[in-house]
């Protein structure tokens, strides 16, 4: 058991040890313990925002309970480009899905942050509001009040935008300037400038429009450069570093505890409508269990995996699923259903002639990059892994080709339009200026890029189910990749478009590509092949063999108007339960058309106002 660097180290200071039945609410409440108005369960991207905003009111006491570790002193989290070093470390939940037929029975690794700040402490630091139409789609699902015009003030409230001279076409007036989540667009790293400009121009040359700022009312559809969550000193902005600052952590009405695993919400059984009374947690699998009450509300912010797990362990979930584990049903709700993730057919590696960051993977180059970051807060280590991205629609003319139409995939597989609106994208292409080395290799002997595509609006839905009644046992995650034919077609189309951009000048002149390659065993094959002659069947086979998660799951406890198809209402209150809300990516009614971290922050900002009664 530990704590953040300013608060709790002993659970006995804020909770009571359980000696009897945890189902006896009156017995638990009879024990004297510190009282909290609000308990936020989960100190991830949303939880840190909620704890900070709710504790602004000195009249209320707030407890933030995080299952993972403190973020204090985690160097690889502070350095923006060092995030791969956190994958499969103790700061990662290191989830693994079940095997899926769509990817040849393989499982998929799901990284999720296991420290304060959650996945915002281990992700790629891209700042993206996604498409304005995403929020219109939320309203259509019954999430009244969540349209973009209502969300925009909360994006701006969170933003602390810092203009940069490398990006003169960005209008700072469209962004917030004093928010905790510092955002910037620059600088463009000097060594990757030429190849970055080549990618932009080649994307334009195949018909994709240029977008200077992905985060405006116009939306992201087009090619451009990502904004980044990075402080001016070159360090990562996470929900923890942005919202749980030393001054916030010093508030006498805020308690932050880490390494406390939420096991279940205690619900009253003597009222007509069940009410959340408190939280049961433990500090180790076989260790002491503790109880802490909440006088006003509990807010579940345990993430797309943790939130449905805690709900089901508390008796809130599909009745049939709860019955499998002999859990009494408090509310029969579709918890764990409607799970969606951004699927990727796998990395598409490209050999280059020059102009990449591969030098930082070598000992001397890495040392020089570290020195530049440590003393000046500059250089590749202060930058994003992904420099350029294209957001496109599958029905865009870019996909047309006189010799081999991009819609050939739709001849075999019917494409379903899952876009949020007429201008919202359903495919993302990305380019990172270095070659990601395979397992067991430190670096490649030549320069290159790592590229890939994301299926932004999948037609496939998955589930989160319990593995057991023990909160320490990871739940069963099944994103159901490529279970819908449309997802297969879009994956084929996206891979083909990416390969076409790579063979379009001026980008092609920077690359070392063969005329064509039929060596499907090569990790370079998807971009080595000729996009005009490679078959749909071959691209599909590659996607099934190499497909993986991009770490953007949502909607496992989604918001909506009906208890038959959603878990929480438009105020994030769990249907049929008093005093319990959900606030994290699990409450998204539908998947968003981009990187979700900024959306989670904005949702939490609005949720705080809903709880305060001012939204």
Curated annotation (Swiss-Prot):
Q: Which residues bind FAD?
A: 45-46, 66-67, 123-126, 585, 596-597
List of catalytic residues: 552 (proton acceptor)
What induces the gene encoding this protein?
Induced in strobilurin-producing conditions (on CGC medium after 6 days of growth).
What this protein needs as a cofactor is: FAD
One Pfam entry for this protein is GMC_oxred_N
Q: Which domain of life is it from?
A: Eukaryota
Entry's InterPro entries? FAD/NAD-bd_sf, GMC_OxRdtase, GMC_OxRdtase_N, GMC_OxRtase_C
Q: Which UniProt keywords apply?
A: FAD, Flavoprotein, Oxidoreductase
Q: How is it used?
A: The structure of strobilurin A was used for the development of the major class of beta-methoxyacrylate agricultural fungicides since its beta-methoxyacrylate toxophore targets the Qo site of complex III of the mitochondrial electron transport chain and prevents adenosine triphosphate synthesis. Compounds such as azoxystrobin (Syngenta) and Kresoxim methyl (BASF) are among the most widely used fungicides worldwide. This class of antifungals are used as effective treatments against a broad range of destructive fungal plant pathogens and make significant contributions to food security.
Q: Which family does it belong to?
A: Belongs to the GMC oxidoreductase family.
What protein am I looking at? Dehydrogenase str4
User: What organism does the record attribute this protein to?
Assistant: Strobilurus tenacellus
Q: Which gene encodes it?
A: str4
């Amino acid at each position: 058991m530990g704590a953040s660097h300013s608060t709790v180290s002993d659970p006995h200071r804020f909770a009571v040890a359980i000696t009897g039945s945890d189902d006896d609410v009156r017995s638990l409440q009879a024990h004297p313990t510190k009282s909290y108005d609000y308990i936020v369960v989960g100190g991830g991207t949303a939880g840190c925002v909620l704890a900070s905003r709710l504790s602004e009111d000195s009249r209320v006491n707030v407890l933030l309970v995080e299952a993972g570790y403190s973020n204090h002193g985690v160097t690889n989290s502070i350095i923006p480009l060092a995030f791969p070093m956190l994958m499969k470390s103790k700061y990662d939940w290191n989830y693994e899905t079940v095997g899926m037929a769509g990817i040849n029975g393989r499982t998929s690794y799901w990284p999720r942050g296991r420290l304060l700040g959650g996945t915002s402490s281990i992700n790629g630091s891209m700042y993206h509001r996604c498409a304005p139409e995403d929020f219109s789609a939320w309203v259509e699902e019954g999430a009244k009040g969540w349209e973009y015009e209502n969300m925009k003030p909360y994006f701006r409230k969170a933003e602390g935008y810092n203009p940069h001279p490398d990006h003169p076409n960005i209008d700072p007036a469209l962004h917030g300037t004093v928010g905790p989540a510092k955002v910037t667009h620059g600088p463009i790293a000097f060594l990757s400038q030429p190849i970055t400009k080549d990618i932009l121009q080649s994307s334009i040359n195949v018909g994709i429009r240029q977008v200077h700022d992905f985060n405006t009312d116009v939306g992201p559809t087009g090619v451009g450069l990502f904004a980044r969550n990075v402080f001016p000193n070159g360090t990562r902005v996470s929900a923890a570093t942005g919202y749980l600052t030393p001054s916030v952590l010093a508030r006498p009405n805020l308690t932050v505890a880490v390494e406390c695993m939420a096991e279940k919400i205690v619900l009253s059984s003597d009222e007509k409508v069940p009410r959340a009374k408190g939280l049961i947690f433990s500090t180790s699998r076989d260790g002491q269990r503790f109880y802490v009450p909440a006088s006003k509300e509990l807010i579940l912010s345990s993430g797309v995996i943790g939130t449905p797990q805690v709900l089901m362990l508390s008796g809130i979930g599909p009745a049939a699923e709860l019955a499998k584990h002999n859990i009494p049903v408090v509310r029969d709700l579709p918890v764990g259903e409607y799970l969606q993730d951004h699927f990727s057919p796998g990395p598409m590696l490209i050999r280059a002639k020059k102009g990449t960051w591969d030098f930082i993977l070598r000992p001397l180059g890495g040392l020089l990059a570290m020195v530049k970051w440590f003393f000046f807060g500059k250089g590749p280590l202060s930058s994003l892994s992904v420099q350029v991205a294209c957001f496109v629609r599958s029905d865009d003319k870019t996909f047309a080709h006189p010799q081999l139409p991009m819609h050939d995939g739709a001849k075999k597989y019917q494409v379903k339009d899952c876009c949020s609106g007429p201008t919202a994208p359903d495919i993302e292409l990305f380019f990172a200026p270095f070659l990601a080395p395979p397992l067991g290799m430190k670096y490649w002997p030549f320069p290159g890029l790592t590229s890939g595509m994301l299926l932004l609006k999948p037609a496939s839905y998955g589930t989160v189910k319990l593995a057991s009644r023990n909160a320490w046992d990871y739940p069963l995650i099944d994103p159901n990749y490529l279970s819908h034919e449309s997802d297969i077609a879009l994956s084929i189309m996206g891979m083909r478009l990416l390969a076409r951009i790579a063979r379009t000048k001026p980008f092609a002149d920077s690359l070392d590509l063969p005329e064509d390659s039929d060596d499907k065993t090569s990790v370079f094959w998807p971009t080595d092949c000729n996009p005009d002659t490679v078959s749909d069947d071959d691209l599909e086979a590659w996607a099934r063999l190499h497909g993986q998660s991009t770490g953007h799951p949502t909607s496992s406890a989604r918001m909506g108007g009906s208890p038959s198809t959603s878990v929480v209402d438009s105020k994030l209150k769990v249907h049929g339960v008093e005093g319990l809300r959900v606030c994290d990516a699990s409450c998204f009614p539908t998947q968003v058309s981009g990187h979700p971290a900024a959306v989670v922050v904005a949702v939490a900002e609005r949720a705080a106002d809903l709880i305060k009664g001012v939204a």
